[in-house]
Amino acid sequence: MSTTAAPTAPSTLRGGEWLLQPSSRDSLFTPEKLTDEHRLIGRTAQEFVQNEILPVLDKLEQKDWELARRLVQRGGDLGLFGVDVPEAYGGVGLDKVSSLVVSEKMAGSASFGATFGAHANLTIVPLMLFGSEAQKQKYLPKLLA
């Protein structure tokens, strides 16, 4: 009589464990797994970078803060700062992969990518993770717009 072990749920690897632990193909993420929704938000971010940031990159690199402020506002209008923030707070309500796709596209925008990353990761993420409900309702819609 042969017994087989019941399948176990994949565990979450921490830190650099992925370097040391075996992994299955199912645990890997490749661009082929992107959905149409992921591609659409990625295209939106890519067009924003190509059409609105790269043409004025020299001005941004010369610290034209008013221009940077306008571009941050435009990115907010496009929903790029609130990709994975729930709609109830003014976000788009997509998943973390969508947020990753946007961040990847924004990385091609030189120093504006740092501006984008700081706004998204130093203000919005901590507020989502640690803010009270009242703080989220008060601040997130303004930060995302």
Model-derived segments and their meaning:
Residues 1-37:
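Intrinsic disorder at enzyme termini
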Residues 3, 7-10, 18-19, 42-46, ...:
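A broad, low-specificity signal for short, low-complexity segments enriched in glycine/proline
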Residues 10, 20-21, 30, 40, ...:
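Alpha-helical protein-protein interaction elements
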Residues 32-56:
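Mature N-terminal segment immediately following signal peptide/propeptide cleavage
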Residues 47-48, 52-145:
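Glycine-rich flavin
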